[in-house]
Swiss-Prot record:
Transmembrane segments: 530-550
Record's protein name: Hemagglutinin
Keywords, comma-separated and alphabetical: Clathrin- and caveolin-independent endocytosis of virus by host, Clathrin-mediated endocytosis of virus by host, Disulfide bond, Fusion of virus membrane with host endosomal membrane, Fusion of virus membrane with host membrane, Glycoprotein, Hemagglutinin, Host cell membrane, Host membrane, Host-virus interaction, Lipoprotein, Membrane, Palmitate, Signal, Transmembrane, Transmembrane helix, Viral attachment to host cell, Viral envelope protein, Viral penetration into host cytoplasm, Virion, Virus endocytosis by host, Virus entry into host cell
GO biological processes: clathrin-dependent endocytosis of virus by host cell; fusion of virus membrane with host endosome membrane; fusion of virus membrane with host plasma membrane; viral budding from plasma membrane; virion attachment to host cell
Subunit structure: Homotrimer of disulfide-linked HA1-HA2.
Amino acid sequence: MKTTIILILLTHWVYSQNPTSGNNTATLCLGHHAVANGTLVKTITDDQIEVTNATELVQSTSIGKICNNPYRVLDGRNCTLIDAMLGDPHCDVFQYENWDLFIERSSAFSNCYPYDIPDYASLRSIVASSGTLEFTAEGFTWTGVTQNGGSGACRRGSADSFFSRLNWLTKSGNSYPTLNVTMPNNNNFDKLYIWGIHHPSTNNEQTKLYIQESGRVTVSTKRSQQTIIPNIGSRPWVRGQSGRISIYWTIVKPGDILMINSNGNLVAPRGYFKMRTGKSSVMRSDAPIDTCVSECITPNGSIPNDKPFQNVNKVTYGKCPKYIKQNTLKLATGMRNVPEKQIRGIFGAIAGFIENGWEGMVDGWYGFRYQNSEGTGQAADLKSTQAAIDQINGKLNRVIERTNEKFHQIEKEFSEVEGRIQDLEKYVEDTKIDLWSYNAELLVALENQHTIDLTDAEMNKLFEKTRRQLRENAEDMGGGCFKIYHKCDNACIGSIRNGTYDHYIYRDEALNNRFQIKGVELKSGYKDWILWISFAISCFLICVVLLGFIMWACQKGNIRCNICI
């Protein structure tokens, strides 16, 4: 009977013990910060993983206006670049202008004799890249012809006029002699000459202007020769004219000679444009020009260039992000986010990083929560936080350096005859965009994977550092927490945090407390064994008592037992 009572008391004592309720132990948990609502990013292994913070890498909107700083932006208003170069009367204001970017408006129009340029895109690109309409007149000698022809389709003020940079030559009296003119280039730069040929609408107009039934224009240099014959015939009426002028251009290198031979229909140059090599360009846009600063310009307006990618427009000028198809790419700049649970752990608010993050920790990425004789507390570990931040800082700049190539992408224009070239160019551009879009997504996924891995690694480093400090003075409780087997006040906790903890000071106390607590702190497996042993002994004692009672009753004659065979 005494044995039963002792076993019952022992079992009750085992279950009633709470080793953490005394003042001679403490609990320390390590964790990382978390936010209630994180940001989803893509990594190599996961399409969607939540992180505490992320930065958008794709610029998807413009500011709606074109900034005039740091580039000199010239508003073409009602003039195209070619009209300004030829000297259309309503574009005289642009003579001798300079620009970094010439803006052509959709409202631009020609207001002179109707013309066409067989290689319009090339001429436009050459003039645009020069960045100037600086013009130098030269003393061409045209003998036996009438100069400075004009037309009612090209009025300057109230008088008939013509393109100011061209000289329309017609008959003088009843003759149009063969013209042979040379002009050497004795300068050390390239000269751009603009000339043309007139296509009358009828044979009568041809002979009326040039005497000959068919003229011819030949322009030559040491490197090239162009011979053009007029195509006489009626064309759709434009500004009262059914004739046309075809504009051509010739570049004369230093030391070369320009030679012009013609017996009619010549629209002669008056001088040359000085060729310059630069990064100037031309762009079609209806966005307003305003006083602001932006290093990247698109037809939609200027955009910031602090992101490596943009989805605003393929056509750009300046220091611009790479164009990609994606509307969004997010670069992880924080750690993996595990929102804090409402109820957890035996200590309520104290739970380690294995279980979840801590939303209340705002002064660092990693830190400690503890419970000791002085209460509970929390503190950030600034060293591990700074180590993670140092590795993440500069990621955005590195991505920009890898992708943000400083260049300008001009518009591509092709005539109908060049349809195959246009298709090929479009295919090449689309392929480049597809390739960059894939590379961008892969690059960001790799960087995100690296960020998450390194922040996880910093958490593990802090845990291992703490474990090595505590040694046998504490036990890993799992979930990122330690049970410290000695009295550890706030100063002691602080020494663990800053790495000055000396486990030898507390070793004897910890070992003594560990043995005392381990003697009664039985884990669930041992408790089960004690329960089974206690149950078996109790049953045995009950049987012994019952058997003894029966034997005693038989001896007294109170119970009679007959055995028959």
